[in-house]
Amino acid sequence: NRDVAACARFIDDFCDTLTPNIYRPRDNGQRCYAVNGHRCDFTVFNTNNGGNPIRASTPNCKTVLRTAANRCPTGGRGKINPNAPFLFAIDPNDGDCSTNF
């Protein structure tokens, strides 16, 4: 099913792997995890419109995604606070992580 609970187990790996990267303004990082014939899409997005490239906070990533997973059974997104530059998202979906051409 597309329940976010099946995706929550990947939060630490996603945040530990993608937040150390440097993101230009309006740039993002994504990762897909396969689970039980479905997929879990995760995103980190630098919402700044200008400025220097920056790194996301690993603890903020984990806090936001855990909060979304606990409050939103079909997935969600958010920031640690309204002025924070990074948006984090967790999105369970049907299908697998492969791309069909």
UniProtKB/Swiss-Prot annotation:
Keywords: Antiviral protein
Function field: Has antiviral activity against tobacco mosaic virus and antitumor activity.
Pfam families to which the protein is assigned, alphabetical: GBD_Y3
Record field: transmembrane: none
Name of the featured protein: Antiviral protein CAP
Natural source organism: Coprinus comatus (Shaggy mane)
Superkingdom, taxonomy of origin: Eukaryota
Gene Ontology BP terms: regulation of defense response to virus
